[in-house]
Structure formats: C-alpha cells, structure tokens
Swiss-Prot record:
Organism (species): Aspergillus tubingensis
Pfam families the UniProt entry points to: Lipase_3 (PF01764)
Name of the protein in question: Feruloyl esterase A
Keyword Secreted (UniProt): yes
Family, per entry: Belongs to the AB hydrolase superfamily. FaeA family.
Keyword DNA damage belongs to the record: no
Enzyme Commission number(s) from the entry: 3.1.1.73
Active site: S154, D214, H267
Paired cysteines (S-S): C50-C278, C112-C115, C247-C254
Cell compartment(s), UniProt: Secreted
Keywords (A to Z) from UniProt: Carbohydrate metabolism, Disulfide bond, Glycoprotein, Hydrolase, Polysaccharide degradation, Secreted, Serine esterase, Signal, Xylan degradation
EC category: hydrolase
Function recorded in the entry: Involved in degradation of plant cell walls. Hydrolyzes the feruloyl-arabinose ester bond in arabinoxylans, and the feruloyl-galactose ester bond in pectin.
InterPro entries associated with the record: AB_hydrolase_fold (IPR029058), AB_hydrolase_lip/est (IPR051299), Fungal_lipase-type (IPR002921)
Amino acid sequence: MKQFSAKYAIAVVVTAGHALAASTQGISEDLYSRLVEMATISQAAYADLCNIPSTIIKGEKIYNSQTDINGWILRDDSSKEIITVFRGTGSDTNLQLDTNYTLTPFDTLPQCNSCEVHGGYYIGWISVQDQVESLVQQQVSQFPDYALTVTGHSLGASLAALTAAQLSATYDNIRLYTFGEPRSNQAFASYMNDAFQASSPDTTQYFRVTHANDGIPNLPPADEGYAHGVVEYWSVDPYSAQNTFVCTGDEVQCCEAQGGQGVNNAHTTYFGMTSGHCTW
C-alpha cells in the first residue's frame, strides 16, 4: 500500500491551488497528544479496550445482539471527563450495516432539520440509543462537573458522530473525536458545524481525523448526497504533530483528494496503531 509522506503531502497542498490557503501544516503537541490518546481508545475498542491509558476507568458495556454494535462508557478522573467509545466494524453483521448506504432521516434528533445519515449506521444507532443516553445520564448524575467526550473509528466514528449529535440536544460540554469517519448528508454536516463550533479550527469541539489516503472518508459517495463538515485533521507519514495538516473548506483537498478506496492500510492504522492489534 502506497504511503503518503509529509514531503508528498506538502506538494499536494501547494499544487492544489485554492486548497493552499485553506490548509496549514502542524498542530500543537498538546492537541496531537490528545488525538493520539483518543485514537488509542478507539483502536483498542476492537479488542476489549486493550492497552488503554492507565488513568481511564472502564465502565458499562454498550451492546446490541441484533446489530452487533459494541461500545463502552469510560471515565477519566484525571481529566474529569466521561468518555463514550464505539468499536468499528468487527463482524459480518456490522458489514451489513456498512453496505446500507440509503440516506435515512435522523428522526431521533428533530432539531437537526433535513438531516439524513447513512442508513445502516442509523439502524445501529437506534439499536443502542436508549442504553447510551441512560448510561451517560447515570455518569453525569454522579459526576456533574465532568465533560463529555465521544470517540470511535470507522463504523465506530459514525456511531460517535450520531451519539454526539444526539447528546448535544441535552448537554453543551461535548467533544467529538473521530478517525476514518464516513460521510452523512450536508444538512447533518452543517448541524455538526454549528453544534460543535466546527467552522474553524480555533473554536471546534469536533475533531475529524483522517490518515494518508484512507479510503473510508470517501464513502458513501458525494454524488449520492453525502458530505463532510468543514474542519479535517489529516495525518501523513511519518506521523507527528508537525505532519498533521489542518484542512478547512473544500473537503476534497486533503485525505479525500488522495484517491483511496475503501478499507486500506491507511484506514486500519492511525498514528502507528492498527485496529485491535494492541501492540502500542
């Protein structure tokens, strides 16, 4: 699988014309460490949360046998946050959800006007919605001054986005971190931009991370009505804070411009961590 180096990435951005002004190279070490931490949790979700940071307390499991959606409620007292994480695709049942591209109204959140989302992931969401909302509320009741964080990779990233959107109707202290997230429709993307102040990297509470030529952020196809939000954090190899690009504006300037298709090496590995391998 072809690797995209920082040198190559700079060439892509410079030759993209209008994309140059909307892309900057390098993020702070603090933000980079935070992205790596959330990627660690998201990748560990494929293997029963192996090797997660020692400060994190593993709480209740989220699970539905019909959709095989898996997730956990975690807590980190050192950072005073309640973390919800979803596993990505891990079974044939999940694959059936992945391939249901039909745009479906996001009916569980009426405030999201005209929002439509990936049909399979919506089925996954409604199968665990009651569990998620109940478990989060239990934690908030016990720790009312804790912030809420939601994260996931691939299918788990889409579930994380739907969860964060739903919780935004009740709570206002949410941060969302996704890795290799597929698209929803433009109305949903706009809602997320507004709800999470994601029109600018200076204000965003929604960190959509991509890697090299990961093919999953290209799906479902834009010509079928799917879209991403404004801000993207694009990691290229060798991964580092300096080799992370902040991309705004036209979504086809960074990861999506690399022509990746479907599940490839760049999708399964983020910041050197491969889904479920737990070798970090």
